[in-house]
Structure formats: structure tokens, C-alpha cells
Amino acid sequence: MQLMEYTQLALFLGLLALMSPVLGRFIGRAVLRGEQTWMHSVLGPVERLIYRASGIRPEARQSWRQYAASLCAFSAAGFLMTFGVLMLQDKLPLNPQGFPGLSWHLAFNTAVSFLTNTNWQSYAGESTVSHFSQMVGLAYHNFVSAAAGLAVAVAVMRGLASQESKTIGNFWADLVRSVLYVLLPISLVLAVVLVGQGVVQTMSAGTEVATLEGGRQFIAMGPTASQVAIKMLGTNGGGFFNANAAHPLENPTALSNLLQMLAIFIIPSSLVFTLGGAVSNRRHAWTVWFVMACLFMVGACSLYRAETLGTPLLTEVAQAPVTNMEGKEVRFGIFGSAMFATVTTDASCGAVNAMHDSLTPLGGLVTLVNMQMGEVIFGGVGSGLYGMVLFILLTVFLAGLMVGRTPDYLGKRIEGREVTLAMLALIIAATPPLLFSAVAAVSGWGQAALNNAGAHGFSEILYAYTSGVQNNGSAFAGLNANSPAWNVTIALAMLIGRFGIMLPMLGVAGSMASRKARPIGEFSFPVSGFTFGLLLTLVIVIVGALTYLPALALGPVVEHFQMLDGLLH
């Protein structure tokens, strides 16, 4: 890496470290505790109007089971609405292109995808989905799916901070506050800034232009900036255009690229400090944040190194070192593309400014491992925080076993119930990618979708199901996944990955809330400092990533050795 690359990395992490504690404190006041903020003079009446119109009593507290039931009911209603909009879009307004309704399996996959904050897209947005579907069906879920994740994270924090309580908050109040005070204001500001950078925002279908070759070309357009802002901020990732953030009308400049990367990480990063404030332990928050930052830097530097080395076959033909610029935009270069790929797979975002299918085998391996570690390297909005809490509980439990102490976290004993729920969440998350990948690899419908045979074809299958279950949404685009079998199985993976972790973590929150915290003494395992950070990192890598090692050995690892032998370029 050169000085310019080091400077860009330091600038990105520096801005993130400066902004995150500030936003984290604000989220703690506005969402976690429901206190008055400077926004309440404007948005407070709107919040109260929503409560009155929908019959919500924000002061009513819910047990973890009631909280989970509200979450599931809200998600089911959102799915039905979006499924109907997509199926009937030819009969709905704001469809200047005259797009027909989606097939049942594509509508099912897409509705589940946006409901679960995955935004996996088996279609090209600008040629398949109307403006109405984009704004009402999809952009709506960009807000509420992120808000649901944020609400669950806040509920988990309450569970850790409360003592001898049977409740963990009110899902409906947490949802409304997350949208009104966090997602909506930041998205509005970011959308305006992106328009200033050249991202389009129009209700027209597009325009026809004369090309340099003398021909005519239709340029698709639409309400892009408003959707890009929330798709990044909410770690959704689904692009208005098929090329996603590589499209010049969606991500035109280096500054827009930096802003979009910051938008992806800012809320997950801030929630770490919200947790620190909730449990009155800011050193713990900084330790967890540095673990996330270190894992991010290792991934970004590894991916950058893999792409700058290129491939031996092309180097031999060129008689000079050739970097891997395939699938990348010149305006971003290798470092800007490697950074974005690392950010988007560390968070459960899935937006791309370069084609991940064109990465070198080791570059693709980095993106896969980022997701397979559980999307806890900052992670998605809310999901990154409660996923990290899962690994923290396991770390403290294992540390207690090693030294013969009763494991406790923040003064509360960790018992069999919490460990069982945590391991259940890990097993639920690991099973669908391995099981569905095995089935697809030997099935006719699975093999028919591949444009690449051998190790890379298997990597495409493994990436698709890993992306689905980790609610990421990015893809190795050589896979033709728009078929009934693919759409249904990936949708099932997305549902399992979303609720198979959310619900056990709500159970953990309810269990921890009922406990009384003991004073933290000299025999308590410290949850800050180098030792804890190192143990947490090892648990994330060993328990998270090594689960998939045999599958990775059959995909990107084999492909890397084939590349070194000159069998691949």
C-alpha cells in the first residue's frame, strides 16, 4: 500500500471514530430512553400523531415474547403488502415504463429480501420494477427493516442494563423512534448531498442521448438519490440500477463513494457506544469498537493486496505486473473498490461498486469470510450489535471455563439458558448456507444456473446462500438465480438468517433483564482491554469463520491454486 491508500484508510476510520460516539449518545437518548432531544420540537408532534393514529401506547412495556410477537406480526404485514405491490405493479400508478407484474417466485423472493434487510436482487431494477414499487414497496422496507433491527438491538441493550425486570421495552415505540429520529433525518441530508454530487433524483422514466459512436442510447433514470441514501444508511444495499453503486448515476464521484461507505458503517458503529452508555462502561465500548476496526483493516488490506497482485497468467502475457482491474470502475481504482467491498460485506449491506464475481480467488475469499464471521464487523443496523453481543457472551463464558470462574457479563451471571440460545443462533445461521449449497451443487436446477463450472461455480453457489442467510444481498453475479428453486431457497435462507438470530437474542435479552447485577470485583472477568479484545477476536474467527473452512477449501482456495498453476486467469 502507498501513502495515498494509508491516508484514505486513516481518514475513513478517523471520521468514523469521531462521529460514532456522538450519534451513539443521541440514539441512546432518542430511542433507548425516549428522552427529549433537539429534534423533538419538530418531530415530537409527528411521533405523537403516529401513536394516536395507530393506537400505540409507548409507555406500555413488553416482555421479550410480546416484543418478538410484535416484530413478527409487523414483518408479516410488511411482506404481504410488498408482495402484493410487486405482483400488481402493472395496475398501480407511477409506472411510466409499463412494466408487468413480477412472477410469484420473484415477488416472493424480493418481498422477503427487503423485509429481512437483505436486498438480494434476482432482477435488474431499472428494467423490472416501477417507480411506485421502488418507492412504496422497496424504499419503505429500507426504512422499516433497518428500524426493526435497530429496535431489537435497543431491546438487547435494555436487557443487559435492566435489573430484575420482566420487560425489555416497546417494539412499536422503538420502531417509530428509530425511523423518525435516526433514519429519516440522516437519509434526507445524505440524499441532498448525493444529489449535489450528481446522483439523479427525478420521476421521469429516463432520457435518450446521442453516443460518441453516433448511435442513440436510452439512459434509465428515476428517484435514485432518495433510495441510495437509505439503502446505505440502513445497510440494505439493493440498488436502483442493476450495476448498483458502480453506476455513474448512483455513485458518481470519489466523495460520494466515501460518503456512502461512511453511511453504511455509521449506525452499526454508533450502536457500540450506545451500548457502552447503556451499561455505563465506555471502555468496554471502545474495546469492542477496536476489535471491529482491526478485523475491518485486516480484511481491507488483504483484499487490496490480492487485487494488486493480479493473476500470474495475465502477468506472464503482459511481461509486467498487472493488477486486477476487471469488474472495477476506473474512477474508484483498486483501493476504492477493495474498501467498498470490505465495508459492504462486513456490514450486512450488499451494495457494490465493483463486481465481486471478478475478484481474484483470494479477494473473493475475503468477502465470503467477512460474511461468514456473522456480519459482526460493525455489521448491519442493529444486527451487528446484537450479533456481537452473542460472541461477547460466548467469549466471557469460555474465559470463565478456562480459569475456573463463574462467567458473568457486566455483573450478571451467564447461565445455561443464555449459552444455549447463543449456540442455537450460531447453528441456525451456519446450517442453511452449507445445506442449501450442497443441494444446489448436485441438483439440475442448481447446475443450470451456473455460467462457470468447477471451483468458481461452487463459490458462486456458496456466496449466494451465505449472502442470503447473513442478510447481505451481494452476489457473485455469474449465477442466474431468477428461477423458482433459487428464488424460494434463497428466500428461506434469508428468513432463517434474520429471525433465527433475532428471536434467540430477544430471549437472551429477556433472560438477562430478569437478573440482578452483582458488583464487579477483582474476580470478575474484565470486558475491556487487550486481553478481552484478543479473546473476542479469536472467538469470532474460530467459532464464526472456521465453521465454513471445508466449504471454502472446495471453492476459492482450490480456485487460487488453479490460478497459480496457470489454469485460470
UniProtKB/Swiss-Prot annotation:
Predominant cellular place of this UniProt entry's protein: membrane
Compartments reported by the entry: Cell inner membrane
Membrane-spanning residues: 3-23, 68-88, 136-156, 179-199, 259-279, 284-304, 384-404, 422-442, 490-510, 534-554
Entry's Gene Ontology molecular function annotations: P-type potassium transmembrane transporter activity; potassium ion binding
Membrane topology type: Multi-pass membrane protein
An example Gene Ontology CC term for this record: plasma membrane
UniProt entry tagged with the keyword Membrane: yes
Keyword Ion transport: yes
Keywords: Cell inner membrane, Cell membrane, Ion transport, Membrane, Potassium, Potassium transport, Transmembrane, Transmembrane helix, Transport
Complexes and interactors: The system is composed of three essential subunits: KdpA, KdpB and KdpC.
Family designation: Belongs to the KdpA family.
Task of the protein: Part of the high-affinity ATP-driven potassium transport (or Kdp) system, which catalyzes the hydrolysis of ATP coupled with the electrogenic transport of potassium into the cytoplasm. This subunit binds the periplasmic potassium ions and delivers the ions to the membrane domain of KdpB through an intramembrane tunnel.
Name of the featured protein: Potassium-transporting ATPase potassium-binding subunit
